[in-house]
Structure formats: structure tokens, C-alpha cells
Amino acid sequence: MTPSTEALPTAVKAQVLAEALPWLKQLHGKIVVIKYGGNAMTDDTLRRAFAADMAFLRNCGIHPVVVHGGGPQITAMLRRLGIPGDFKGGFRVTTPEVLDVARMVLFGQVGRELVNLINAHGPYAVGITGEDAQLFTAVRRSVTVDGVTTDIGLVGDVERVNAAAVLDLIAARRIPVVSTLAPDAEGVVHNINADTAAAALAEALGAEKLLMLTDVEGLYTSWPNRDSLVSEIDTATLSQLLPTLEAGMIPKVEACLRAVSAGVPSAHVIDGRVEHCVLVELFTDAGTGTKVVSS
């Protein structure tokens, strides 16, 4: 028990634990897809807390599926190797050389580190990529920059999901840790935005929830007015709000809209800078961050 919990009165501890019961019952046996990113995957304390949360969910009979990116780590490795990097329209221009680095970093570094952190709690996590068992099929995408359609190289969207491999891991009570690399129909591998991939996977798995870890407290209807933080919003309202959001938040909101519109009961934008934010969101009445529901 940490010093922070030791300082709490016994009655408060009891109330928190009792409050979790209906949520534990509701989520038992259900799939929860978590997009892991931001400070939660670069700060050592937060990384360990996230891994513990995944083990906690698994031991409560809930099925977590983790989808991760690795933008900062890819940038650092490109710099270390002396490979120039460029961004257009908010996306990394991905040459074959850059893709080789992305594959090495996403699956060989970021994914491995998270798998090992989770497995410190037991033999739970298994790392896979969208290349494994045809999990994802990619389709190449472009971006619009100043009104001009612009090629950004080997960057894709998810065209199809074959969830069989992930479902097999879930049936074996493993925790899938998914790196978002995927081949197109011709076998050419692309890097896929992790927010997009998480939403597509949540839809294909029939997940109960999609959680998006960010570096903000949730969704603000009028940023930077911190009083505009909303605890719940429906898809119709959020769709209207989308054009006004900060650029970095748009892919996350689009992912939430896609998942909920496809039948996932709720998507949640939560603050990954808070230790055990996943547990707070799932097992307390007030939760944390912003919950997105169908209109």
C-alpha cells in the first residue's frame, strides 16, 4: 500500500472499493480497447502504473486490448541514426527508410517494453502487429495541405480488420499489445495512426469501451478555457465541435466518433498523466476525463 493510500481514512477506502462493484460486474467478461500514448508511455512511473492497471483488469475478468503508437520514440531514433524526418499535414512523411525505423521502434522497442512491464505481474501480455495473422489491412492515405492533396509516403488507414488473432489471445486470457503496422492488399507495409487503429479494432471486437489516453484532462468545448471541460458529450454535439478542436486532438475525437457510431457503447478521452487513470475511469462513478456516447 502506498503512503498516499495509507493516509486515507478507512471509511474512504471502503467507499472507493464498494463503488467499484457495479462497474466490475458490468465489465466482467467484456473487451476494453485502450489507446496507449502520450506521457503515459514516456514517464517511468506512469508506464509502470499503466502496466499494473492492465494486469488488474485481467485479474478482474475484464479483457484489455492495448493499441500503442510511438511517435516520440520514432523521432528520437531517426535523429540518433541521422535520418531526416518531415511532417506534412500533421503526419510523418514515411519513406521506406523511415518505415524500417518505425517497425523497429514500434514492435521492437515500445511494444517490447510494455509487454515486459505487464508481464512483471504475470505471464499475461503478448505483442503483435497489424502484420500478424492479417490483423489489419491498410490502404494508403494522403493529406490535404493548403488545399493540395499531398503524398506522405507509406502511411495508411485501416481498410479491414481480421480480429481472429486478437480473439484467440483473449480466449487464452492474454493481453494483446498491438503495434500499428499493417500491409496493404499488395503486401506493402504501412504505418497507421494508432488512434485510427484503436477505433477500428474496438469496432471489430465489439468492445464495451474505447479509452484514449491523452496529455490533457479531457475534451474542452472552448480551449483554453479550462472551465469548458465536459464530462460527457454525445456524438452529434461532438461532430459539430470537431472543426474547432486543437489539431492534436482531432484524430482522437475522430476515433471516438468512429467507434461509438459503429456500436461501441462509449469512448473515453482521459488524462494519461494521472497514475492509474484507467482504473479511475472504469471503476468510479465520477470517472475522469470525457465520455463520448451515441446521440
Swiss-Prot record:
Its main location: cytoplasm. Its EC number is 2.7.2.8. The keyword Nucleotide-binding applies. SUPFAM superfamilies: Carbamate kinase-like (SSF53633). The record marks K35, K252 as: Transition state stabilizer. GO terms for molecular function: acetylglutamate kinase activity; ATP binding. GO terms for biological process: arginine biosynthetic process via ornithine; L-arginine biosynthetic process. Keywords: Amino-acid biosynthesis, Arginine biosynthesis, ATP-binding, Cytoplasm, Kinase, Nucleotide-binding, Transferase. Pathway: Amino-acid biosynthesis; L-arginine biosynthesis; N(2)-acetyl-L-ornithine from L-glutamate: step 2/4. It is found in: Cytoplasm. One of its GO terms (cellular component) is cytoplasm. It is an enzyme of class 2 (transferase). It comes from the Bacteria. The keyword Electron transport does not apply. It holds the Pfam family AA_kinase. Substrate binds at G70, G71, R92, N191. It catalyses: N-acetyl-L-glutamate + ATP = N-acetyl-L-glutamyl 5-phosphate + ADP. Belongs to the acetylglutamate kinase family. ArgB subfamily. Catalyzes the ATP-dependent phosphorylation of N-acetyl-L-glutamate. This is Acetylglutamate kinase. It comes from Mycobacterium avium (strain 104).
